Amino acid sequence: MFMEEFFIVFPEGDIQEVPGRLPFNTLVDMNGNVLSLPLPTNKMIAFRVARITTSEKKGSSETFHFLELMSAEELLSYVKSGRTVVDGRF
């Protein structure tokens, strides 16, 4: 039996298991769920999958998705027009 495990690695080094592989450069929430685009607002915590590594051993593989925290300013390009938050205001 071959076992595949998938993890997200937060910028501070914490690791959390996720149910499956995440595409490179995808936006995800704190639980590793892919965010639907366009985003409703830029006032949210979102990460970008910045790097992916896979470690294979006999009978198993571990895939690590390294995340990068996105700023509110960076998220503006992913938001519906007309509903953005800048400096804490809509």
Set out the residue ranges of the language-model regions.
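Short, solvent-exposed secondary-structure boundary/capping segments
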Residues: 55-70
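A structural detector for beta-sheet-dominated domains
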Residues: 9-11, 31, 50, 68-70
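Intrinsically disordered, low-complexity, charged/polar segments
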Residues: 2-8, 68-90
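Mixed-charge, Lys/Arg-rich low-complexity intrinsically disordered regions
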Residues: 1-24
